Structures are given as structure tokens and as C-alpha cells.
Amino acid sequence: VFVLNKSKVRNVRLKTNKADTGGKLEIFILNIISDYECECLLNFSGKKVKGTEITTDIVNFKILDKDIDTFIISTDIKIESLIEKYGITPLPPYIDDDPSKYNYYKADFSSGGFSVAASTAGLHFNKEMISKLEVENKIIKYINLDVGIGTFKPIESRFIEDHKVHNENYSINKNDFKEILKLKKEGYKIYAVGTTVLRTLETVIKTNIFKGTTDLYIKPGYQYELVDYLITNFHAPNSSLLSIVLSIYGEGWKELYMYAQSKNLKFLSFGDAVLFKIT
């Protein structure tokens, strides 16, 4: 049984210029709060304090609130309209912002949801491959987990146990989940295509809640209850994603990653994948 995350990467990066100075300004939308309000990252020179009003070439906005590194802003244009008209694909910062790469950062089976980053293991699958798996009597199921920016936030605490993972919205069809449980009892192996799928399935098996938010942080010592195999890319150091690898593979991950490097395998979002056996 292969389970994939169908949440679609939205065009949440807005690049524009200040109307008064012409200075570059970027809005990275993280979450839509209402038609005219969103949570976002802001990148421009100048003050970024509560009450600041900015006029740009595409939208006027006001900073309503500020957290450590995120902002709540109100706009004079609907957020969805901004995304549809001006948004571009939010490639990771270590990938050159080349429009020719945008389609490669979106799985062609994705639909619905609101992800601001890709579930990169799913990028190894396309509709043709999924059809071939189904012809071979493999069972395909889908979850939705809206990938947030927190998924890739580095672990900055001294001990990985002290790290906190941001809440992310997830959902799975109740009947699909029951079928997955039934198939597992019948001896089928459950393959999670990506850490987002792994975290969703493990959240649901523990809570029996089919739609909600999860901040499940998987680290060494975690007891897996449902998933048998994980397909995932090679991850950056000091990340909660690598903590998942550590929980499955142990300290041997370093030798594994060094071996991958020696074979010129590619890391991170557009990189190669590895299959881990969990149970």
C-alpha cells in the first residue's frame, strides 16, 4: 500500500517593488486567515513594525501583528487573487529561482490543500508511475498534509528533544484509513511516501482523528504503530526531518549519507530518495 500526500504547492511567493522608492519587496504567504488577511514572511529594507503601511506596485498592505519572524498583514486585494495573479512557485532558497523549474516542484497528482513547500518524496511519482503500480495490484491511497515553513525549520535547541514542530493541517478519508488498517492486518506493507505521510498516519493511528492539526515530532525512541516503510529524500543536517531518519536508522545515518555522497546521489528537494524499512 503506497500512501502519498496530495496537498498542492501554492504560488505563495509575491515579488514586487515599493511604490515610493522602487526597492525590492517580497511577501511569502504562509496561511490565509481571511479574504484580506494572511500570515506571511516579509523581506524588504525598512521598518517592519505593527502599524506600518506599505504601498507596492501590486498591493497595499498594513502590518497588523508581528511574531518572532512572521507577520499578520491586511491587504487591499483578496489574498487568493494575489496568489492567482502575481504568485510564483516558492522554490527553496538553495535552488535558483528559475521559472523552468517550477513545474518540477509540484507533483502532477497533487490537488487541493495549501502547501508552501513540496512533499519532495512525492516528486518521484507521477500519474504514469502510479497507474503502473495499480496495474501491478499495488494499492494507492492519499492523505492531505499542508506543508508549512516549519517543516524545514532547523533544530536550534541544544538537545533535539527540546525542539518544537509547528502545527500543520492534515486530513485523511475515514474509509481510506480503515481500509489501510484492514490491509495491514491482512499482511500488506504500508509505504509512506514522504515524512508528511508518515507523520499524518502515525498521528491518526494514535488519535483516531481524521482531520485536524498535528505537531508530531518524531525523534529517536519513537514507537511506530502503522507504517512499515518510508520513502524519503536525503535531508539537511539539524532538521526535524533528519531526526525521523535517526529514529529509524540510528547513528548509522552518517555512514549512509557519506555512501550516498560517494555515489554522487543528490540531496534535498530535487535530490534522490532512499527507502527505509521501519519494522
Positions of PLM-derived features:
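Surface-exposed, charge/polar-rich loops and edge strands
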Residues: V1-T279
